[in-house]
């Protein structure tokens, strides 16, 4: 049977395709900008007819209707990375959060620890050989499709065709739903003067020939424009967004000096606007892989001069990093931070960087704290942290004692909080305030 005939036989309406979801099943939804919204809408229509269906995904960009209070009992959401659309539901106890390294999520599927009944995907139309592309979202979805008992694909002619390990054949799909609609997009973060100040300090650590990993948000977006005078940069990252386009077009990012996968932008998924979607479409400089590959610390470490730039919510004076919760309120997830910091720390000339603003809540609280807030989780241990960058400078912690770490972190904290940080250090006998900063007794 030709793939064309097989494809036509598998065509279904969204409602027909989602009848595959039965009570008690576990359903995977392709995350990020590749979220199959037509299938999600049909899944919600199915909701009143099913009970105890677990929905698993990394981070979706849609409205997440499955966590609405009226869906309780029908759907239970389990996020391996928390987005703003499910944060309240998780902290209200109506949904779950599974903390895990991004590099290890696929192991849950392949090992049977988290068996998948149904995978809901969004793919490009098949090519002349019957292969559909995962487009902007290979991430954990290729492996999910390989492990799920039933695969439903939303075929969208607006999904880019991307290169790399990013294809699935029509024969591996059980139901096809054709739906042409724009992909989910994200707005570019507003770059503030604060972001620019932090970015300037980060950029000072990036040399010609460096290989970059950056996330999304104001700080990463602010770093990239500072690199327009660099030469032969490369990219090995879990994600890429719009900010990389000018550097690629200018030839700054060309991968010429990469010793691992030279001349290729290695990426797991794309987050951004239609501009970046169009840019990656049939663009051979991009090579997409599952995040078990992009985030493998051993592979990351093969990149000489690997620079990993990640952020955090809090850092204590010993160097412990919290990046997934605010106290006991879960905020995001572990994601790829540890994967890339570990990989960069083992790379020749590597630089693992935590870049944060020194304060939060309009400058009313310090992000550099004596102790992490009660209930906060340590995502990155003090032994792994090397560079901490704020708008006030760079603290280098690797190989430093607790006394030296505390001093370095206080030096890059906001000046208005330094006295109380020193007071804590004096009470714990970690560190004495420098003579010039001793507060005279009254």
Predicted regions and their residues:
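Conserved alpha/beta enzyme-core scaffold
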Residues: 1-442
């Amino acid at each position: 049977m030709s793939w064309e005939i097989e494809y036509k036989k598998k065509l279904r309406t969204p409602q027909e395709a989602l009848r595959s979801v039965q009570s008690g099943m576990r359903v995977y939804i392709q995350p990020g900008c590749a979220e199959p919204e037509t299938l999600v809408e049909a899944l919600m229509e199915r909701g009143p007819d099913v009970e105890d269906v677990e929905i698993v995904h990394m981070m979706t960009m849609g409205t997440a209707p499955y966590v609405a209070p009226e869906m309780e009992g029908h759907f239970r959401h389990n996020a391996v990375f928390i987005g703003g659309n499910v944060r309240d539901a998780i902290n209200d106890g109506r949904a779950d959060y599974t903390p895990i390294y991004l590099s290890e999520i696929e192991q849950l599927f392949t090992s049977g620890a988290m068996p998948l009944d149904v995978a809901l995907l969004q793919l490009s139309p098949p090519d002349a050989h019957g292969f559909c592309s995962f487009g902007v979202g290979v991430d954990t979805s290729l492996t999910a499709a390989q492990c799920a008992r039933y695969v439903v694909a939303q075929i969208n002619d607006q999904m880019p065709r991307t290169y790399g390990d990013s294809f699935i054949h029509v024969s591996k799909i059980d139901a096809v739903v054709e739906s042409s609609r724009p992909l989910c997009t994200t707005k570019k973060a507003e770059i503030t003067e604060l972001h620019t100040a932090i970015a300037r300090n980060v950029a000072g650590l990036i040399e010609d020939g460096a290989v970059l990993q950056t996330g999304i948000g104001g700080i990463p977006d602010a770093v990239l424009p500072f690199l327009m005078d660099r030469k032969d940069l490369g990219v090995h990252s879990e994600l890429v967004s719009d900010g990389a386009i000018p550097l690629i077009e200018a030839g700054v990012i060309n991968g010429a000096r990469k010793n691992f996968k030279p001349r290729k932008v290695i990426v797991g998924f794309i987050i951004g606007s239609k501009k970046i979607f169009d840019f990656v479409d049939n663009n051979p400089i991009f090579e997409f892989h599952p995040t078990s590959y992009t985030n493998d610390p051993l592979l990351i470490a093969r990149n000489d001069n690997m620079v990993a730039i990640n952020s955090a919510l809090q850092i204590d004076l010993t160097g412990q990093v919290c990046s997934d919760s605010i106290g006991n309120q879960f905020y995001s997830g572990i994601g790829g931070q540890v994967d890339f910091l570990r990989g960069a720390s083992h790379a020749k000339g590597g630089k693992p960087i935590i870049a944060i603003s020194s304060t939060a809540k309009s400058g009313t609280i310090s992000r550099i704290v004596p102790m992490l807030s009660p209930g906060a989780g340590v995502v990155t241990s003090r032994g792994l942290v090397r560079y901490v960058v704020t708008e006030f400078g760079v603290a280098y912690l690797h190989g430093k004692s607790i006394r030296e770490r505390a001093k370095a972190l206080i030096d890059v904290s906001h000046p208005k909080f330094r006295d109380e940080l020193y007071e804590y250090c004096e009470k714990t006998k970690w560190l004495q305030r420098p003579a010039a900063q001793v507060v005279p007794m009254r």
